[in-house]
Amino acid sequence: MFEHGEMAEASQLAALAQRFRPAVLAAEQTLPVAEAFLPLLPLDGLPRGSRVSVSGAGATSITMALLAEASRGGSWTAIVGVPSWGWAASVRSGVAAQRTVVVDEPPVSQWGQVIAALVDTFDLVVVDPTHQVTASDARRLAARTRERGSVMVDVRVDDGRRRFRWPIDADLSFSVSTSAWSGLGDGFGRLDDRELTVSASGRRGADRQRRIQVRLDGSGRLAAALANSGGRT
C-alpha cells in the first residue's frame, strides 16, 4: 500500500481496483454509519453511488465520525489531498488504518483520472480539491460513483483556503453550524468533549433539512447524540 504522503500513480490505483474492489450485492444500498447520524439520513446509512459534502468548522471531525462505522465494518477508504485530515485523529475516531490509503492531491490535469481510479477501487473516497472541478469531470465522476456504488465525500473546512463550487450539487450536504468545547476550568485543565450541531439536506429523499447535536470525546470518537430536529420518526 502507499505510505502517508506518498503520491500514487493512476496506473497503480487501477491495479488496486482489480485486487481489492469488494463485491457489492444489490441489497447493499448503503454504507453503515453510527446510530447517532441516522436521523440525518433518508436511508439507514450513506447511500452508495452518492456524493456527500461536509462543510463548516468541525467538518473533518464529522467526516471521520461518519466514516468510522463503515471503515470498521470492512470498507476501504481513500483520502486524497485533504490537509486537515490527521492520521492519528482518524484512527482515534474509529477509522481503520489498515483499510485507509492517503494520497497527495494529483496535478489538476490528472485529478479526474486519479479520482476515477480511486472510485473504482474504494468504497469511500474523501477529497478536498484546490481547483475548480470541471463540469465534464463532475459528470464523469458522478456516473462512475453511481456505477461502482462508491461514496465520494467532499470536505470543506473553514481554514481560509479558497473553495470552488462543484458544478453539480451534492446528493447529501452536511453542515456544521456550531461548535463548542468543554473541559477547561478556571484557567486550567484541557479541552475534552466537543459538541457539534450538524444539519443535513439534499436529494434522493433528503430534501427536508434535518438537524442533530452530537458530542465527540477528546479523542474525536463519537460519544453521544444529544438531540435531533426534523429527523425520522
Language-model segments: what does each one mean?
Residues 78-134, 138-141:
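Long, charge-dense
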Residues 120-175:
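A contiguous pocket-lining binding segment that forms or flanks enzyme active sites
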Residues 1-79, 226-233:
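Detector for small/aliphatic-rich hydrophobic stretches
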Residues 52, 78, 101-103, 153, ...:
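Hydrophobic/aromatic beta-strand patches that form the interior of the parallel beta-sheet core
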Residues 72-76, 97, 147-151:
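Structural alpha-beta junctions
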Residues 159-226, 233:
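Phosphate-binding/switch region of NTP-binding enzymes
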Residues 41-42, 71, 91, 119, ...:
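Signal for well-folded cores of large energy- and translation-related assemblies
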